[in-house]
């Protein structure tokens, strides 16, 4: 692919894809090109004792690896389109458009589910969640963003499978939280997390995980502030305006920052350095090195 296009760049180490740049300036478009991958049975994979956090050295030179819980850590094997479709999570994500024949290839009745506005997992849902627990969050994100109904068999294992997210690196969970809040349906995403019983995944969202229907008089100023910020974020996305992760983090942590800041001022600290110290302390306590300060600072 790279040899066909002048402005093409190979991306990735584990599984390489090609980014082809079309157009120039602000109007340029990046087209992602990847190869179909084979569907591999978990019982045919090499198994490592730990997880992705503890087994990096065990992954060297291997193409198909699962951890002790059954999560797929690596599956870099080329395959035909029909097997690539079987690897997808939802039926609506396994649709292939052939630009030559102008035909949509549908191996798993995705068009039918699309018309019925249904999220259905391909294969056995419990197994698919074990392969990649982050699929739980994709279910929530798609349901909130599209307004689709989660098919009963897809929904049934979700609460039990949530414990598998303990093995996911915090950096990836942080990124998934940001994705939920940047969909343009942040409030709906929070409601869906609550609806599916996934209330303990993101401590930063804990203030919003109260029971639905709480009277306005009992909704704290902190909750109202965060909900207002997320509503504003949803509005910005709807207007095709940018949303900075640093802004969302600031809104989520502002209540704690303000309390610490005011306490420092009451003890005689100067306002500006006290504010910076409060921000640093709350960031370290609530976020730590999850995403890296540089990434957020550049935002």
Report the location of each language-model feature.
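Catalytic cores of the polymerase beta-like nucleotidyltransferase superfamily
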Residues: 1-299
């Amino acid at each position: 692919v790279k040899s066909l296009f002048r402005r093409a760049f190979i991306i990735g180490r584990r599984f390489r894809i090609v980014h082809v740049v079309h157009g120039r300036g602000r109007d340029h478009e990046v087209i992602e090109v990847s190869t179909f991958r084979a569907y591999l049975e978990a019982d045919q994979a090499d198994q490592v004792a730990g997880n992705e956090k503890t087994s990096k050295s065990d992954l060297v030179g291997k193409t198909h690896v699962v951890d002790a819980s059954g999560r797929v850590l690596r599956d870099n094997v080329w395959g035909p389109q029909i097997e690539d479709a079987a690897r997808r999570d939802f039926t609506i994500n396994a649709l292939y458009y052939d630009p030559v024949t102008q035909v949509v290839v549908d191996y798993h009745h995705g068009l039918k589910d699309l018309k019925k506005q249904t999220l259905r997992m391909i294969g056995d849902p419990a197994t698919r969640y074990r392969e990649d627990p982050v699929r739980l969050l994709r279910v929530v994100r798609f349901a909130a963003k599209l307004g689709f109904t989660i098919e009963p068999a897809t929904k049934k294992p979700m609460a039990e499978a949530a414990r598998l997210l303990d093995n996911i690196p915090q950096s990836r969970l942080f990124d998934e939280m940001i994705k939920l809040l940047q969909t343009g349906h942040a409030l709906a995403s929070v409601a869906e997390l609550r609806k599916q019983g996934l209330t303990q995944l993101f401590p930063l969202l804990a203030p919003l995980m109260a029971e639905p229907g709480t009277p306005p008089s009992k909704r704290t100023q902190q909750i109202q502030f965060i909900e207002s910020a997320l509503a504003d974020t949803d509005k910005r996305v709807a207007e095709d305006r940018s949303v900075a992760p640093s802004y969302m983090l600031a809104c989520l942590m502002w209540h704690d920052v303000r309390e610490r800041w005011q306490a420092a001022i009451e003890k005689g600290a100067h306002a500006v350095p006290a504010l910076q110290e409060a921000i640093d302390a709350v960031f370290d306590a609530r976020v730590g090195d999850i995403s890296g300060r540089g990434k957020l600072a550049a935002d």
